[in-house]
């Protein structure tokens, strides 16, 4: 558990004969996607370890970074993923963030409706809808507004101590 940094289940690990991690898949998925992930893990060029070596070697083209971010996502390597996302986003023209292939990357940059990039989503709403679909975009915007309310719903902000009579 400690050696492979397993924090919860399900974790699927592909190891070499010496027990070294080659690829990691965290969470469940439908069978076709799971098969794709396992096939990737068995490919030395596309597995987590292979792609990490390429990244450390300086590989930084857009397609590679997008693919690597996807691998890091499936491996639940959030800290490293976030640093790769920052490199990736810095290479893009802001309008490229609107594209469907960048939706999950763009949304990972947002914590809630107060996030720095949230106004970009609202200002480019029609373009995001055209690329990603109205339901997906609308649902995501709703979630961003709801996240602002979470601290009050769970009393992280001292809501119960707030005295309405003082207002």
At which residue positions do the language-model features occur?
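Compositionally biased alpha-helical segments
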Residues: 1-2
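Sec-dependent signal peptide cleavage junction
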Residues: 44-59
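Oxidative protein folding and maturation machinery
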Residues: 55-167
């Amino acid at each position: 558990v400690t050696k492979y940094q397993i924090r919860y289940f399900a974790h699927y690990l592909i190891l070499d004969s010496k027990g070294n991690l080659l690829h990691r898949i965290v969470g469940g998925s439908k069978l076709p996607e799971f098969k794709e992930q396992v096939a990737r893990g068995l490919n030395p060029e596309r597995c987590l370890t292979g792609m990490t070596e390429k990244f450390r070697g300086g590989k930084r083209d857009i397609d590679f970074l997008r693919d690597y971010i996807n691998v890091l996502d499936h491996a639940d390597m959030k800290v490293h993923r976030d640093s790769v996302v920052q490199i990736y986003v810095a290479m893009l023209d802001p309008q490229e963030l609107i594209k469907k292939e960048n939706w999950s990357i763009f949304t990972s940059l947002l914590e809630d409706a107060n996030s720095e990039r949230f106004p970009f989503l609202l200002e480019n709403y029609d373009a995001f809808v055209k690329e990603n679909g109205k339901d997906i975009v609308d649902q995501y915007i709703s979630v961003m507004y709801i996240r602002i309310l979470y601290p009050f719903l769970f009393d992280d902000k001292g809501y119960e101590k707030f005295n309405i009579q003082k207002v």
